[in-house]
């Protein structure tokens, strides 16, 4: 992972610093996806909160374009903040585990990630279109 953009470097340092304070490790994989579920499901990023026995982690696949994985980092960082702040949508998803609760959480998370991208001047290209496509694909995958 070679990051040259100063805003991207600063954001990565911010995420690393804040996650460390919350017992969350920041991990980067070199592939286009990472293993993100016990059944070896794959994704571009994943957040797991810490528990009483183990540190949590944010894992990001960096094998694609940096504009894409920086967007994923903003998304997973947002999940970490939701967990830490006991955000109602995070708690609802944790409690209910339903597809609709997950979709509502992801919709909010993408909006927040796009705000972070803009606030920190991250070089993420057309992040709004990427977010819209992700949410459209997720919505289309919901059980009718």
Question: How does the language model describe each region?
Answer:
Residues 1-13, 102, 113-114:
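A short, highly charged nucleic-acid-interacting micro-segment common to nuclease
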Residues 10-13, 17, 21-59, 66-67:
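Catalytic zinc-binding patch centered on the HExxH motif and its immediate surroundings
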Residues 11-14, 18, 76, 116, ...:
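Charge-rich, solvent-exposed alpha-helical interaction surfaces
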Residues 60-63, 83:
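Short His-Asn-centered micro-motif
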Residues 65-68, 99-102, 114-144:
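Long, well-structured alpha-helical subdomains associated
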Residues 67, 83-115:
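Post-HEXXH active-site segment of zinc metalloproteases
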Residues 71-84:
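Active-site recognition of the HExxH zinc-binding catalytic motif
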């Amino acid at each position: 992972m070679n990051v040259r953009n100063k805003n991207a470097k600063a954001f990565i340092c911010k995420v690393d610093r804040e996650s460390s304070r919350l017992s969350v490790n920041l991990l980067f994989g070199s592939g286009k996806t990472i293993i993100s579920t016990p059944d070896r499901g794959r994704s571009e990023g994943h957040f797991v909160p810490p528990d009483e026995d183990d540190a949590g982690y944010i894992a990001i696949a960096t094998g694609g374009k940096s504009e894409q994985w920086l967007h994923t980092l903003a998304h997973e960082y947002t999940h970490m903040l939701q967990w830490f702040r006991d955000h109602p949508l995070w708690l609802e998803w944790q409690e209910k585990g339903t597809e609709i609760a997950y979709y509502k959480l992801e919709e909010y998370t993408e909006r927040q990630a796009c705000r972070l991208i803009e606030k920190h001047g991250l070089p993420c290209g057309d992040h709004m279109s990427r977010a819209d496509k992700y949410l459209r694909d997720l919505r289309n995958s919901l059980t009718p």
